[in-house]
A protein has these predicted regions:
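Extracytoplasmic gate region of multi-pass secondary transporters
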Residues: 31-72, 78
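A late C-terminal transmembrane helix in Major Facilitator Superfamily
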Residues: 145-181
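A membrane-interface helix-boundary motif in multi-pass transporters
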Residues: 173-195
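Intracellular juxtamembrane helix-capping segments at the cytosolic ends
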Residues: 133-146
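Structural signature of the two symmetry-related core transmembrane helices
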Residues: 95-110
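Helix-to-loop junctions at the C-terminal end of transmembrane segments
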Residues: 80-94, 177-178
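Juxtamembrane intracellular "pre-TM" segments in multi-pass secondary transporters
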Residues: 4-38, 217
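C-terminal membrane-cytosol helix-exit motif in multi-pass small-molecule transporters
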Residues: 1-13, 199-207
Length: 217
């Protein structure tokens, strides 16, 4: 009985430490929307590597095997930060997402500026590393926007944005190329680079807010 009472007290203390903004659903709606929007944006930014890099490399007369290798390195880089995420966040703290976006921006720039493997390889790695840091941070942050019994629902909404961004990317890309009257294979990288730079300034300016202030223990 004493153990049960102690567990109940711990659970109540955990619930009281989570800010749900007075939401009646046990979820801080504004924070959840911010997380969803940010995750959708960064996923849209990085999937340019999957969708458009093969066409860009084909234009520069690389083989399909070369583009496949680059995409494999991109996914490998996404997984790498998970092995030392706490150290990364402990070092960068509220600037974690801003510097991760800077990594993505630099990666896109390297892919865009020259058709050389020795630039495209680090470009793919930098994009993957930046995304690999941000993704688990968003999942962790989501648990602080909902009560424990609502955390799974909140995570489902956030994770939905990943698939939604992938689903909509080809349609948005085609629409933007139609709007700007271009069929350039570099255009998606330039456009996503601009989005990344804008998002970087947003993250840096708002580094002390709920969405961007990351301090894992």
């Amino acid at each position: 009985a004493a153990v049960s009472s102690s567990q109940k007290d711990d659970s109540e203390a955990e619930d009281s430490s989570i800010d749900i903004g007075g939401g009646k659903y046990g979820i801080h709606i504004r924070h959840l929307i911010q997380l969803m929007a940010f995750y959708g944006i960064i996923t849209y930014i990085v999937v340019v590597v999957i969708f458009n890099l093969p066409f860009l490399m084909e234009k520069h007369h690389f083989s399909s095997g070369n583009s496949g290798l680059m995409i494999s390195l991109f996914f490998l880089a996404i997984t790498a930060p998970g092995f030392c995420l706490n150290k990364i966040v402990g070092l960068l703290k509220e600037r974690t997402k801003a510097y991760s976006l800077l990594s993505i921006a630099l990666g896109l720039l390297l892919i865009w500026i020259a058709p050389l493997e020795w630039l495209i390889i680090p470009g793919c790695l930098l994009v993957g590393l930046g995304y690999g840091v941000i993704q688990p941070m968003l999942y962790e942050k989501t648990t602080h926007a909902a009560l424990p019994q609502k955390a799974t629902m909140a995570l489902a909404f956030v994770m939905m944005m990943n698939y939604l961004a992938i689903l909509l990317y080809p349609f948005i890309g085609d629409f933007l190329q139609w709007v700007f009257h271009t069929q350039s294979q570099e255009f998606p990288f330039i456009f996503n680079l601009l989005i990344t730079v804008g998002t970087f300034f947003w993250a840096y300016r708002c580094r002390d807010t709920f969405l961007f202030n990351d301090q894992l223990k």
